[in-house]
Every structure is written in structure tokens, then in C-alpha cells.
Amino acid sequence: MAEKIDINRIQRDMFIEYKGEPYRVVDYDHVKPGKGQAFVRVKAKNMNTGNAIEITYKSSDSIELADFEQVFAEFSYKDADEYHFLTQNTHEMISINAEDIKEEAKFLKEGMTVVVFIYKNKPIGIELPKAVELEVIETDPGFKGDTAAGGSKPAKLETGAVIQVPFFINEGDIVKVDTRTGQYLERLDRAQKK
């Protein structure tokens, strides 16, 4: 049976069960109105469907933690409709439906270590590292003077994702990208690339 905790102990990225479905807490807010009882507003993402919902709890409620297993695995390959990962401890192959991780797949490349979420013996999602280093394979060339005004341009990365980068970024550059927001963080020297 899953563990229950007081709603006031809720945290971001915590896994909870709501109406028999697994959710990941995206955000929460403790609200104390002038009149009436305090409550907690929780924004959560359904780990099966990817849909986000808002749930309101009384401050006296308790929530059920979802019974997730988290496994470190290395991305091996993708076929027509599944991504395949090799677990680090047991060296078992785990397959996940491409639809279940379509957002994360934008920044996924072979050999990358991720966390695979398993719920009731079924892999249902992954968590990427917070930032990844990827090569720019296609972008318009920068011109002198473009950097003075700031601004950005689209760039296609080696994984196929398209992000906005500063004008001084060129094809072949290695950039660090925040996987949660898809935002450019910095350009790396080739010597810095791991």
C-alpha cells in the first residue's frame, strides 16, 4: 500500500496518486484566505496521459504518494514507435512508447543516462538531465553587428529539436540547453564538451 503524507509536506516533482492515476507535482501553492479554511492548490501532470490538472486540497487533508520505481538507464536506440533503454544495474532492456515521451525525446541522444519511471511494472516516462550539450546542425549564419541588438534565431540541434539561439551561434557549435524549458543556456568550446 502506498504511503500517505500530510498535504502540507508536498513538494515539487513529488509523485502522488489521485483518483487511481499517477501524477507528478509541477507546482503548488499554500493559500490562506482572509476568511475560511486554508487550502493547498496543486498543479500536477498525469504520468500516463501527460495532461495537467489543478487539484485543491484542504490544509487538513493527506495525499497518497504514488508507488514509483526509478531506474537509471542509458538510451540505446529508437525504432518505429518505441525508445529502448538499457538499465545500468541489471542490464535489462526497457522499452517506452514514443508517444509517452515525445516532449523529452526532443533532447534525447544515444548514450544519454536518464531516469526511467516505472509504475505498476510499466515504464511510463523518463526524466532527462536538467541540461544537455548538443551540436547545432543547422542555422542561418551570423553577421557582424547582429549581436549589438541582441535577439535570436532558430537552430536545429543534432536530436532534431529546434530552439532559439543568439545570433553568434553557428553550425557545428556545441550548446547547452535546459531540458525543462528548451531554452539555450550557453555555448561551449569543443574542448569543454564531455
Curated annotation (Swiss-Prot):
It comes from the Bacteria. One of its GO terms (cellular component) is cytoplasm. GO terms for biological process: peptide biosynthetic process. The keyword Cytoplasm applies. Pathway: Protein biosynthesis; polypeptide chain elongation. GO terms for molecular function: translation elongation factor activity. It is found in: Cytoplasm. Keywords: Cytoplasm, Elongation factor, Protein biosynthesis. Its main location: cytoplasm. SMART domains: EFP, Elong-fact-P_C. Belongs to the elongation factor P family. Involved in peptide bond synthesis. Stimulates efficient translation and peptide-bond synthesis on native or reconstituted 70S ribosomes in vitro. Probably functions indirectly by altering the affinity of the ribosome for aminoacyl-tRNA, thus increasing their reactivity as acceptors for peptidyl transferase. This is Elongation factor P.
